[in-house]
Amino acid sequence: MNVKTEPDRSRDVSQPLDKLGPDETLKANSDYLRGTIKQSLADEITAAVTANDAKLMKFFGIYQQDDRDIRDERRRQKLEAAFSFMVRVRLPGGVCSPSQWLKLDALGRAYGGDTLRLTTRQTFQLHRIMKHNMRAVIQGLRDVLLDTRAACGDDTRGVMCTVNPDLSKLHAEVYALAKQASDHAVHRTGAYQEIWYEAERQDTDGPEEPFYGRTYMPRKFKIGFAIPPSNDIDVYGQDLGFIAIARRGKLKGFNVAIGGGLGRTDQSPKTYPRLATVIGYIDADKLFPTIDAVMSVQRDYGDRLDRLHARFKYTIDEKGLDWIKAEAERRLGFALEPAQPYTFTSNGDPLGWVKGEDGREHCTLFIQNGRVINTPDHPMMDGLRAIAQVHKGMFRITPNQNLIISDIAPEDRPAIAALMKQYGLDQFETRSGLRLNSMACVALPTCGLAMAESERYLPDLVTKIEAILNVHGLKDDPITIRMTGCPNGCSRPYIAEIGLTGRAPGKYNLYLGGGFHGERLNKMYLENVGEGAILEALDKTLGHYARDRKPGEHFGDFAIRAGYVVEVKEGRFFND
């Protein structure tokens, strides 16, 4: 191997704080994330918290936001912005009980604008929480054994796990490890209990953060567990991905993939999405040492000067994959074994009913863009509450923002199915293949980074694309389409067959050629265009696809074969 022996350390944690970015000083001087958050919460003059406290609160799963629909009007009236907060739950693998669902439903109705949001990382978000209500929300979550620690911030984000109920035993094994991984990697500071539960500070015998230290990670770090043949979690988009390898239906171990990440900045060509690289295999009992070793390499060598360059993918491409692997193995004390064979067939959700190995049944419901809300013609939130009141199994959020009513005894299926029909929750049976494989981030009006609409616009755009699909006989074909309101990639648009990222109000970059299994990045086809140009381009390319595709060929593969875009073989060539 061509391994670099002396990597550049001028931008990592080995340097004095005054040589690094301001966020590193903020973290180091925050008293393990305490900052002045208590004082900010007590300040009744403003609905906001201080800028520094807003950054620290991300480590507790909380984002300060404002209603951008009325921002200009409030400015004209010389009022402060209409501040509120988004609260994200830590929910490894997306699994919650009926009692937890009912609590979240109640909190959403009382404090979150009568809605819940299912996310692309298998958890819940509550939006429009007022500052004076945040403790009530977080303490309400505690009542059902949920918290929001590390759902945002420079730490290990929510741990993902394939939702594969038809492989019940294997899923149970992998999910148990994913849940343990979430607990293993979460930060240890007592600040969360002191601020949100109003607990007394406890003395500690050792370091308050034995793994993270005072400055935590350089940037977010994402971990996910995939169970082939499903790649629903988009394992190649994770900083650290584990691909389950089974023998005779029992978990044997994991292939290890490192360096995935999909965020980028349009104005910064040095930023790009990258798919994770599989570097080897470990037995299941080596999982937690491997997590520690890989994370510690990024903790120690990640860029802490430039946050646009701070994700693990850039550390790998700068230091070299061979060096990163060798350093992780040095810390592990053993070499990874060669990767084991595996096959992915899809990164979508099989909607409808399936029966698991244990005889229990599961039904996957289509939740458009993850938005759980009542509308005059579709009382979805009421319907899911009614199911939670009688359901004896679990709820499982998928990485595609859908919802599985899981672990249903055969004798209970008729009652659950009747509620689904009563509340219109079975409408997935009439949806197009494109809509069922669509995904959008929240974007406007609450996300401060959004430059264009996403969740509020994609359903209407899909309706217009469906008219094109009908003309070309493609209505039922599964084609992935994903939209974000900015280039940061929260709905993973850069691995969709059709990707759209916001540039300005009504303007988007259009990407084509992503892999249907999540195994290939797409490539920009049109830049900064409006709806008319998007529909014209899709009419052309989808029509060509309908006429000339090969048997079993997916649209993303065709877009490359037909020459609409070139294949992106490595993330660092994405912007070429």
Curated annotation (Swiss-Prot):
<keyword id="KW-0004">4Fe-4S</keyword>
<dbReference type="InterPro" id="IPR006067">
    <property type="entry name" value="NO2/SO3_Rdtase_4Fe4S_dom"/>
</dbReference>
<dbReference type="GO" id="GO:0019344">
    <property type="term" value="P:cysteine biosynthetic process"/>
</dbReference>
<comment type="function">
    <text>Component of the sulfite reductase complex that catalyzes the 6-electron reduction of sulfite to sulfide. This is one of several activities required for the biosynthesis of L-cysteine from sulfate.</text>
</comment>
<dbReference type="InterPro" id="IPR005117">
    <property type="entry name" value="NiRdtase/SiRdtase_haem-b_fer"/>
</dbReference>
<keyword id="KW-0411">Iron-sulfur</keyword>
<feature type="binding site">
    <location>
        <position position="490"/>
    </location>
    <ligand>
        <name>[4Fe-4S] cluster</name>
    </ligand>
</feature>
<comment type="subunit">
    <text>Alpha(8)-beta(8). The alpha component is a flavoprotein, the beta component is a hemoprotein.</text>
</comment>
<dbReference type="GO" id="GO:0000103">
    <property type="term" value="P:sulfate assimilation"/>
</dbReference>
<feature type="binding site" description="axial binding residue">
    <location>
        <position position="490"/>
    </location>
    <ligand>
        <name>siroheme</name>
    </ligand>
</feature>
<keyword id="KW-0521">NADP</keyword>
<dbReference type="Pfam" id="PF03460">
    <property type="entry name" value="NIR_SIR_ferr"/>
</dbReference>
<dbReference type="GO" id="GO:0050661">
    <property type="term" value="F:NADP binding"/>
</dbReference>
<dbReference type="InterPro" id="IPR006066">
    <property type="entry name" value="NO2/SO3_Rdtase_FeS/sirohaem_BS"/>
</dbReference>
<feature type="binding site">
    <location>
        <position position="447"/>
    </location>
    <ligand>
        <name>[4Fe-4S] cluster</name>
    </ligand>
</feature>
<feature type="binding site">
    <location>
        <position position="486"/>
    </location>
    <ligand>
        <name>[4Fe-4S] cluster</name>
    </ligand>
</feature>
<dbReference type="GO" id="GO:0051539">
    <property type="term" value="F:4 iron, 4 sulfur cluster binding"/>
</dbReference>
<dbReference type="GO" id="GO:0070814">
    <property type="term" value="P:hydrogen sulfide biosynthetic process"/>
</dbReference>
<feature type="region of interest" description="Disordered">
    <location>
        <begin position="1"/>
        <end position="25"/>
    </location>
</feature>
<feature type="compositionally biased region" description="Basic and acidic residues">
    <location>
        <begin position="1"/>
        <end position="12"/>
    </location>
</feature>
<dbReference type="GO" id="GO:0020037">
    <property type="term" value="F:heme binding"/>
</dbReference>
<keyword id="KW-0408">Iron</keyword>
<keyword id="KW-0028">Amino-acid biosynthesis</keyword>
<dbReference type="GO" id="GO:0046872">
    <property type="term" value="F:metal ion binding"/>
</dbReference>
<comment type="similarity">
    <text>Belongs to the nitrite and sulfite reductase 4Fe-4S domain family.</text>
</comment>
<protein>
    <recommendedName>
        <fullName>Sulfite reductase [NADPH] hemoprotein beta-component</fullName>
        <ecNumber>1.8.1.2</ecNumber>
    </recommendedName>
</protein>
<dbReference type="InterPro" id="IPR036136">
    <property type="entry name" value="Nit/Sulf_reduc_fer-like_dom_sf"/>
</dbReference>
<dbReference type="InterPro" id="IPR011786">
    <property type="entry name" value="CysI"/>
</dbReference>
<dbReference type="InterPro" id="IPR045169">
    <property type="entry name" value="NO2/SO3_Rdtase_4Fe4S_prot"/>
</dbReference>
<dbReference type="GO" id="GO:0050311">
    <property type="term" value="F:sulfite reductase (ferredoxin) activity"/>
</dbReference>
<comment type="pathway">
    <text>Sulfur metabolism; hydrogen sulfide biosynthesis; hydrogen sulfide from sulfite (NADPH route): step 1/1.</text>
</comment>
<dbReference type="InterPro" id="IPR045854">
    <property type="entry name" value="NO2/SO3_Rdtase_4Fe4S_sf"/>
</dbReference>
<feature type="binding site">
    <location>
        <position position="441"/>
    </location>
    <ligand>
        <name>[4Fe-4S] cluster</name>
    </ligand>
</feature>
<keyword id="KW-0349">Heme</keyword>
<keyword id="KW-0198">Cysteine biosynthesis</keyword>
<dbReference type="GO" id="GO:0004783">
    <property type="term" value="F:sulfite reductase (NADPH) activity"/>
</dbReference>
<keyword id="KW-0479">Metal-binding</keyword>
<keyword id="KW-0560">Oxidoreductase</keyword>
<dbReference type="Pfam" id="PF01077">
    <property type="entry name" value="NIR_SIR"/>
</dbReference>
<dbReference type="GO" id="GO:0009337">
    <property type="term" value="C:sulfite reductase complex (NADPH)"/>
</dbReference>
